[in-house]
């Protein structure tokens, strides 16, 4: 009962989607429309590049967060690992 009653604001996935600039209303509507058969076409419109049309961000907290993490972490990781990987490659 409490899980279903949780406000969307506290949902982990919703926080990540909001950080990407997607309003909670779109995420919630996307979740509801995906449940209906006719909602597929509508869900694709709302999906945008960050939202996968076949997966609901509200139901996938870890995966939903993972979709947004690679983008910010990509440029952040590039400066660190290369310095450690180059000497390792030279040793090999």
UniProtKB/Swiss-Prot annotation:
Going by the entry's taxonomy, the superkingdom of the source organism is recorded as Eukaryota
Residue ranges of region Disordered?
60-92
Q: What is this protein called in UniProt?
A: Putative Wilms tumor upstream neighbor 1 gene protein
Source organism: Homo sapiens (Human)
Instruction: Tell me what gene encodes this.
Output: WT1-AS
